[in-house]
């Protein structure tokens, strides 16, 4: 797109905005880029703040232009242009929202502003006609009374206090805000001589006041919109604060419980179940080993004692036999055969009986050892099982 065409369209837009008395700054860079954010404020000002007549027409058509996003705002604007202004833009709604089409968008904005100004003139002229007709009727009634009474050419006015005021000027000035004090009645004939210049001044004053009123209302509406937008954020923050306070309370309770547990558990040692079971199994094994070692020691001592006793008994048996053999030819009679036989028989029997006891004790110790082995095997099997608790 040529830069000359853009500059020409921007100049046209500046001229129209001067006629429209646009108070805010224009984003020329955004308009050149085709950014819709630069043109939407101008359109909203033309429809809502420029003319009270146009705003009344929009309110009567039940179209809302405030508190909407860009897409809904453009939908409402296109509907107004179609129904009330008989204007169809060159671009579609999607094209207008997108970036680009700068020259076409500037042209559409200029056309919208011209349509609004034209509609303002039409509506203002329609409201001026009935007021002028009323003034003509009132002036027609006052002319014969003035000719009959031959009132001088001095202008007659009415002060706010209700009294008649005369001035040296030829043109009359009527103050509109009239009220009666002390039941003073004022005739309509005295208020009739009003010139066309005064009418123009009054209409311009009315237009100025009516145009200024929406400018005062717009900030109020914006403030309400901001409050509406801020209220959900405030509620969300309040909920977050309440949740944080609840969590802080829970943390304080947990800290108190931990302190109580620390005080109760002072001097106590915490051990895991698995480690405790392992310790118990090891202790049982050690106890069994100690018992087995003691029994083995006793068995060894017992065997040593038996061996000592056996050796002593054998020595005793051998010594008297030799003595008997040596002393027999000298001093032993024949009758002593029975006694020697009896004396020889007793220690042999005792040795035999003692050997039988040794065999019995060995058998009992072997059985005990077998039982202990079984106990060890059972404990080993129990320790292999992980789910078993002693």
Swiss-Prot record:
Coiled-coil annotated spans: 233-267, 361-385
Functional note: Centriole-enriched microtubule-binding protein involved in centriole biogenesis. In collaboration with CEP295 and POC1B, is required for the centriole-to-centrosome conversion by ensuring the formation of bona fide centriole wall. Functions as a linker component that maintains centrosome cohesion. Associates with CROCC and regulates its stability and localization to the centrosome.
Protein name: Centrosomal protein of 44 kDa
Modification Phosphothreonine, positions: 346
Region (Binds with microtubules and centrioles): 11-195
MF-aspect GO terms: microtubule binding
Disulfide cysteine pairs (residue numbers): none
């Amino acid at each position: 797109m040529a830069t000359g065409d853009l500059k020409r369209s921007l100049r046209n837009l500046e001229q129209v905005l001067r006629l429209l008395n646009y108070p805010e700054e224009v984003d020329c860079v955004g308009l050149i880029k085709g950014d819709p954010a630069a043109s939407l404020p101008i359109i909203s000002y033309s429809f809502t703040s420029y003319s009270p007549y146009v705003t009344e027409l929009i309110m009567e058509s039940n179209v809302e232009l405030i508190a909407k996003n860009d897409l809904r705002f453009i939908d409402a604007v296109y509907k107004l242009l179609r129904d009330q202004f008989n204007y169809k833009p060159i671009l579609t709604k999607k094209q207008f929202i997108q970036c680009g089409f700068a020259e076409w968008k500037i042209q559409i904005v200029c056309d919208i502003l011209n349509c609004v100004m034209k509609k303002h003139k039409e509506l203002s002229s329609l409201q001026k006609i009935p007021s002028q007709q009323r003034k003509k009727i009132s002036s027609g009634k006052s002319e014969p009374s003035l000719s009959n009474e031959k009132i001088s050419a001095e202008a007659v006015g009415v002060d706010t206090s209700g009294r008649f005021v005369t001035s040296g000027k030829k043109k009359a000035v009527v103050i509109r805000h009239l009220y009666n004090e002390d039941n003073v009645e004022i005739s309509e004939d005295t208020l009739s001589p009003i010139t066309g210049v005064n009418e123009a001044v009054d209409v311009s004053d009315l237009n100025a006041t009516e145009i200024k009123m929406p400018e005062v209302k717009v900030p109020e509406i914006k403030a309400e919109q901001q409050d509406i937008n801020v209220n959900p954020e405030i509620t969300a923050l309040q909920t977050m604060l309440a949740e944080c306070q609840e969590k802080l309370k829970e943390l304080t309770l947990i800290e108190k419980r931990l302190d109580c547990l620390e005080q109760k558990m002072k001097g106590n040692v915490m051990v895991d179940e698995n480690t405790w079971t392992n310790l118990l199994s090891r202790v049982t094994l050690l106890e069994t080993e100690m018992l087995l070692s003691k029994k083995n020691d006793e068995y060894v001592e017992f065997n040593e004692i038996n061996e000592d006793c056996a050796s002593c008994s054998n020595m005793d048996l051998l010594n008297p036999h030799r003595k008997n053999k040596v002393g027999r030819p000298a001093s032993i009679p024949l009758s002593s055969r029975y006694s020697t036989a009896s004396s020889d028989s007793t220690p042999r029997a005792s040795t035999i009986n003692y050997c039988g006891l040794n065999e019995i004790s060995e058998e009992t110790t072997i059985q005990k050892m077998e039982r202990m082995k079984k106990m060890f095997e059972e404990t080993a099997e129990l320790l292999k099982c992980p789910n078993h608790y002693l």
